[in-house]
Amino acid sequence: MARLFSLKPLVLALGFCFGTHCAADTVAAEEADGRVAEGGAQGASESAQASDLTLGSTCLFCSNESGSPERTEAAVQGSGEASVPEDYTRIVADRMEGQSKVKVRAEGSVIIERDGAVLNTDWADYDQSGDTVTVGDRFALQQDGTLIRGETLTYNLDQQTGEAHNVRMETEQGGRRLQSVSRTAEMLGEGRYKLTETQFNTCSAGDAGWYVKAASVEADRGKGIGVAKHAAFVFGGVPLFYTPWADFPLDGNRKSGLLVPSVSAGSDGVSLSVPYYFNLAPNFDATFAPGIIGERGATFDGQIRYLRPDYSGQTDLTWLPHDKKSGRNNRYQAKWQHRHDISDTLQAGVDFNQVSDSGYYRDFYGGEEIAGNVNLNRRVWLDYGGRAAGGSLNAGLSVQKYQTLANQSGYKDEPYAIMPRLSADWHKNAGRAQIGVSAQFTRFSHDGRQDGSRLVVYPGIKWDFSNSWGYVRPKLGLHATYYSLDSFGGKASRSVGRVLPVVNIDGGTTFERNTRLFGGGVVQTIEPRLFYNYIPAKSQNDLPNFDSSESSFGYGQLFRENLYYGNDRINAANSLSTAVQSRILDGATGEERFRAGIGQKFYFKDDAVMLDGSVGKNPRSRSDWVAFASGGIGGRFTLDSSIHYNQNDKRAEHYAVGAGYRPAPGKVLNARYKYGRNEKIYLQADGSYFYDKLSQLDLSAQWPLTRNLSAVVRYNYGFEAKKPIEMLAGAEYKSSCGCWGAGVYAQRYVTGENTYKNAVFFSLQLKDLSSVGRNPAGRMDVAVPGYIPAHSLSAGRNKRP
């Protein structure tokens, strides 16, 4: 919920104690001291006059070079004398008269001090019979970082009630600033008060670029609740939102109430959502957001969050009763994430995702969300981590079944469900050796394929011979797999197995030298590495393929013993990987700045196990070259590149190169090109994948155009498709004082082979209060690597380039 403001009750500031030390015979002795402070008190009182009861200028684009609020402490003048004893009050003035225990009047540069609070005023009357103090024509009160100024104040010290007129307040606590003006301020006793005709914001002094205007505000500090009636949000002098009633917390704690609406526009028309927040308990809250999407209809969003020392979670639900655009009913998206720490060694969790139909992401999300949500995860798990048999044991039990969404042609490639999986990994150190065993039992289920169970047991032993200059790590293992397959398609049930030995040796060394680079001292390393791997070739075409897939060939694959993901396929290997990498480390901190590497694999046998399980022949004696380079150059430039080069055909199979320039926060230039000669593009209607060249250029930038205005752009172009994949352009503005920031963004992106979607959204950030519209940060982080929202940049940092 938006945190509007928090006021201190005046009873603490004006709790005067007129004792015998304020008697008439003492007043005369203090007159001389009062004249010393006359100049300061007079100036403060004059500044307190509220001749124009406004927060300041409503100009949105006025310059403020300082960008910082004035200090409230300078507006009140103290007496300069020793501190006042607790519960005693000091009055310093040009003139004082009256009778002790009846009435006292102080005039001329009046300074009243009590318990750290200081009050400046033109005159003050204290009626001891009614225990009431009246001050005017102007007053200024300073206490605990809060400055309250006004014209007149009448206050009953005993009942803690009173009224002030034309009141202006400024406060700063915990780095958060608040200023307000009110026609009247009624003190209702015991921390309760009422403000009428009030305006407030969190901007610098005199800045009213935005504010909240209310007919009245009632606050109860004991309950920590404030209630505003007939409140409007005003931006640039123009009211944007109105509510007849709103409540809010005074102490910064969460409070049930309306949140700021969200507004956007796009291919589906204008969208509006009005959320309401329920603070159900300190560890339990909920949000309900009814809304409307212009061309689709009413929507209802809900979220529940809970947090306990031993468990936490979140549930999200979006429901569209009737989609006018598609004609579908009851479209929805549901999510539930839960984690439970049952004990120090036992954890459990749930990850559940589901949508109503396969077109949900295409209709309501962008291209990246569409590509990343083909198989929606639905998983329940239980994990154990502890000690057993003198070693470390990690075990788990899980059940997993995906919701697979069909492509636009109606075809979907659904993975097997895991019903269930039980896994365990145990290892124990014995000197330089480590012995261990991994085991996994999985029951696979599928509506249209053969079901079965798989047991994998993989015992092994490895040694670690390492020192300061390098390492040698040999390993011996035995990979055993057993299947129990159900009858399917007229075939009887059967059992089958596979046992393969695994031998590999990983070794490397490190050479270092101190040098100078990028204007400072660095350490450069040269790290050659060898990896020998042996696994005999064995036909596996009689084994099912429940979860194995090919991995793309890159630098990391040089050191994998199995190039297939999953346990159904194990490659044949009699090869030696040779590689060398170099790193640049900061000479003072050891932080890595840059690394690059290149490597190749040499084959001693030509056997190869294919994905279908058959054993084929690899006519090559060595693999393609793979290389990479990534890191920072000179503190401003970044590089991230990789290549897979086919030396036989003398062509690149795949490469990507990206460069970035980031001279300062808020200044980002990115360029990235990606090429793949034979990439998996999309799933066709017949169930096969379409492979083609992938050639894409991605340009993005965030750059200041003026001191306050920045541009954000992204252009992602597909050369093979001969069309843009995504285009984005936006402008962000931050006020000079940082009181508010705003952005407007337009986006066009691909949702299918021949379909696009357009979107326009805006955001308005209000300092220390809330945001209006959609928060662009998450989307921009992906679109523009290195992006920082303009309102998050320090004032004055966004200089003209």
Swiss-Prot record:
GO terms for cellular component: cell outer membrane; transporter complex. Its main location: membrane. InterPro entries: LipoPS_assembly_LptD, LptD, LptD_C. It is found in: Cell outer membrane. Keywords: Cell outer membrane, Membrane, Signal. One of its GO terms (biological process) is Gram-negative-bacterium-type cell outer membrane assembly. Residues 1-23 form the signal peptide. Gene3D superfamilies: Lipopolysaccharide (LPS) transport protein A like domain. Belongs to the LptD family. Together with LptE, is involved in the assembly of lipopolysaccharide (LPS) at the surface of the outer membrane. Component of the lipopolysaccharide transport and assembly complex. Interacts with LptE and LptA. HAMAP family: LPS_assembly_LptD. This is LPS-assembly protein LptD.
